[in-house]
UniProtKB/Swiss-Prot annotation:
This is WD repeat-containing protein AAC3. PANTHER family: THO COMPLEX SUBUNIT 3, THO COMPLEX SUBUNIT 3 THO3. It comes from Dictyostelium discoideum (Social amoeba). The keyword Repeat applies. The gene is AAC3. Several proteins derive from AAC-rich mRNA, which, due to a frameshift also have ACA and CAA codons and thus are Asn-, Thr- or Gln-rich. The lineage of its organism: Eukaryota, Amoebozoa, Evosea, Eumycetozoa, Dictyostelia.
Length: 478
């Protein structure tokens, strides 16, 4: 027999053990076989399991507490680093602001000396009483002295000159502001030399054309002919002051060397072009077409690298950020599509994000001189300002009830000018978002601030009753 249940115990007692051994009844308190010598606590095995579970839970809680303490310490370290970075950035911004203030003060001092010298020279002139005096200086305007900014622009005059015999479509300064070009529906690009001091200088290597300019510091130097249709947009190289690209409805992009007055390259895009832009390093060009294609052109070889088709999106304008890392496209959906530029990749571009902000088609966009902000003008009459790093809209400017056609930042980033189909150009102070000055004119197709001076060039529409000149430059002080 294997075992038998003892009536006086809850335990099985082996019955075949040796006589005289150490087996005994549990109730007698004698030494028992090691198998039965363990004193079980109240509750038996369930109590042991509960103790083990409690110990495991305590260990897990301790581990979680340690992890939380570690995370809190890491977060504290990150916040401390961010705080130090913010302090460094604020210090750098303060230093840059002081440097800018010193520069502006030196400029004001120089202008004051020049003005004093001019007044002394003209004091004996009989005609000096007929010369309007403008005393407001261009400086760093803030929300506390907006009246001075308004007064400054109200004292400015406009100088105009005639070149295009048909509608002007685009106007652009070269990188150093020594040349200004305009394009027209007649398929001709016209280039003028520009000297802010009034010293005109013709290009002896080009076929000069006569100028009807009313001032002596802008003089037409050359006509560039080669397109078979209207030229919709022109763009200067940011690295070469004599290279110019033109986008025509004849389905080609032309690269011009203004110094010799000749086309040095032609690239077919297989569709009517509406916009063209150089990359900041001058190595690439992007062009968008009327049938919503984007052409990427390599400049050293002057060949097309790739043509992209965007279905369902009517492209209106294309552009680069100031670092050349992003290609942005404005479309008829009121959105801006941001693409990462990958020059060494076979695809060359990768979609990053869509910027939603307008209820109607976006016609124009432009980066500020620092590259921090992007302005976009829309058919909903709103100009939006975007922080390109965060890709968030941070500010808006209300132009009017008319669609915005062109936007441009001043050289120092203080002001933004916006034109529309109506007969005005509005100048806004960016920091305060306030309108500062209105330029009365016919509808403007294109405008652009000078790269180093507070001068605004624009191409007015031709009015049948009052034909405007091809190009006007606003911002002169007497």
């Amino acid at each position: 027999m294997g075992s038998r249940l003892n009536p006086s115990s809850n335990m099985y007692i082996p019955m075949n053990g040796p006589r005289g051994g150490y087996y005994g009844m549990p109730s007698m308190g004698q030494l028992q076989h090691p198998l039965f010598n363990y004193q079980f606590p109240p509750g038996g095995f369930q109590h042991l399991q509960q103790q083990q579970q409690q110990q495991q839970q305590q260990q897990q809680q301790q581990q979680q507490q340690q992890q939380q303490q570690t995370q809190v310490q890491q977060l504290h370290n990150q916040l401390h680093q961010q705080h130090n970075q913010q302090i460094q950035q604020q210090a750098q911004a303060t230093q840059q602001h002081l440097q800018t203030q010193q520069y502006l003060q030196s400029q004001i001092h120089q202008q004051s000396q020049q003005s004093q010298l001019s007044n002394n020279l003209n004091s004996n002139s009989k005609e000096s009483t007929n010369i309007p005096k403008t005393n407001t200086q261009y400086t760093n305007f803030d929300s506390k002295n907006l009246d001075l900014a308004s007064r400054y622009f109200s004292e400015c005059s406009t100088k105009d000159f005639i070149g295009n015999k048909k509608k002007s479509t685009s106007v652009a300064w070269n990188a150093n502001g020594t040349k200004i070009a305009s394009s027209g529906s007649d398929g001709i690009v016209r280039v003028w030399n520009f000297d802010p001091l009034g010293n005109s200088n013709n290009n002896n290597n080009s076929n000069n054309t006569s100028s009807n300019s009313k001032n002596n510091n802008i003089k037409e130097t050359i006509e560039l002919k080669g397109h078979d249709g209207s030229i919709e947009k022109i763009s200067w190289s940011p690295k070469n002051n004599d290279l110019l690209a033109s986008a025509g409805t004849d389905k080609v992009i032309k690269i011009w060397d203004v110094k010799i007055g000749k086309c040095i390259g032609t690239v077919s895009t297989n569709s009517e072009n509406i916009d063209v832009r150089w990359s900041p390093d001058g190595q690439f060009i992007v062009a968008c077409t009327r049938d919503d294609h984007l052409a990427l052109i390599d400049l050293p070889t002057i060949k097309t690298l790739k043509i992209y088709k965007f279905n369902g999106e009517e492209l209106n304008q294309v552009g680069w950020d100031n670092n050349g890392d992003l290609i942005l496209m404005a479309n008829s959906m009121g959105n801006i599509e941001a693409y990462k530029f990958l020059p060494k990749s076979t695809t060359h571009v990768k979609h990053l994000k869509t910027l939603y902000g307008h209820t109607a088609s976006i016609y124009c966009m432009e980066f500020d001189p620092t590259g921090k902000y992007l302005a976009a003008g829309s058919a909903d009459s709103i100009v939006s300002l975007w922080d390109i790093e965060d890709m968030m809209c941070v500010k808006t400017f209300i132009k009017s009830t008319f669609p915005c056609r062109s936007v441009s930042f001043s050289f120092d980033g203080q002001f933004i000018a916006a034109s529309s189909f109506e007969s005005t150009i509005e100048i806004f102070h960016i920091e305060s978002s306030q309108p500062i000055h209105t330029i009365e004119c016919s509808g403007v197709s294109s405008l652009m601030w000078h790269p180093t001076l507070p001068l605004l060039a624009y191409a007015p529409e031709i009015n049948e009753n009052n034909k405007d000149p091809s190009i006007r430059v606003f911002g002169y002080h007497s």
